[in-house]
Amino acid sequence: METTQKPKEIIGHLMVLSTIVIYSFNTNFMKILMPEWIDPHGLVLIRCTVMAFGFWIISLFIPANKQQAKPKRKDIFMMMLGGLLGIGGNLLLYINGLNITGPVDAFVIRTVQPIIVIALAVLILHADFNRYKAIGIVLGLAGTLYVSITPHAGAVKDSFTGDVLIFVASVFNALYLILIKPYTQKFNSVIVMRWMSLAAFILVLPFGLHQALKAPLFTSEAPVHICLELGFVLILATMIAYFLNLKALLYISPFVESVYIYLLPITGAIVSISLGLQKFSWHDPIALVLIIAGFALINKKKKVKVVINKS
């Protein structure tokens, strides 16, 4: 049993690592696309439209024996709630935040997500809580606050507001990871994505329709590199990355999956600086150290005293 479980865990880890590489480029490509070629809500709508149509079409070709259990109304409602939090709400907040802050800041703030997962587990699932977890959560939040209030170099419109939006998006995503985990065990991943993406599409449609229709991306001739970057965002970052993240929950826990986000500030910053989208700043590594220190404290295990009876 253990030997078969290990390869499956490795598959889960590889899936999440793949999404980290995709997201490192995706955030930077979205920064290039916005707002010159398309506004934030318009980009979110296009992503959710591609996702919804894509997964509904794919689901039609899944054999009945591969679909596992048939979702009940309550299951569909919970999966759609997951879509509202983890796709629609998360993307609306994150992409609007990214539009007015730097990509490196976005990567650093996203690293607070494992801490949020633990904090929510304490609040919702009544997980164990101690002073180390309390100090760790405070340190993680301090790191997020530090990167948000420090001055920024480069063309950043309203970094603080953007950083706050990205933080709230991380809360939405953490809630989604906790909520959707049981449904990845019960139903085929494509079926789960089908209902989640439909809910996300319904949520973002009224926000993004006007922006999508008037976007220069579609009303004027866009350069080849812009079209390729859009293709990357829509196919790799929207369809494939979301599917891999969901599929990985079959093999690893939401907590383990969220830990991989600590790689993002490194891989993402390399891409950001290479593309000239943000200059290197010492504020970001300092904030990252605070967040990682908080994470380490949260995971500090209590020492168990062993009492030896000599009688």
Where are the regions that the model predicts?
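Hydrophobic alpha-helical transmembrane segments of multi-pass integral membrane proteins
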Residues: 10-15, 41-61, 81, 136-142, ...
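Glycine-/small-residue-enriched transmembrane alpha-helix faces in small-molecule transporters
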Residues: 1-46, 155-182, 202-206, 309-311
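Hydrophobic/aromatic residues within transmembrane alpha-helices
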Residues: 33, 43, 47, 97, ...
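Hydrophobic/small/kink-forming positions within alpha-helical transmembrane segments
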Residues: 24, 56, 83-88, 92, ...
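Helix-helix packing/entry segments at the starts of transmembrane helices
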Residues: 46, 87, 91, 105-112, ...
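Specific transmembrane alpha-helical segments of multi-pass solute transporters/efflux pumps
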Residues: 22, 27, 56-104, 109, ...
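Membrane-interface helix termini and inter-helical loops of multi-pass transporters
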Residues: 29-40, 67, 99, 148-159, ...
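Hydrophobic transmembrane alpha-helices of multi-pass small-molecule transport proteins
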Residues: 55, 120, 129-151, 204, ...
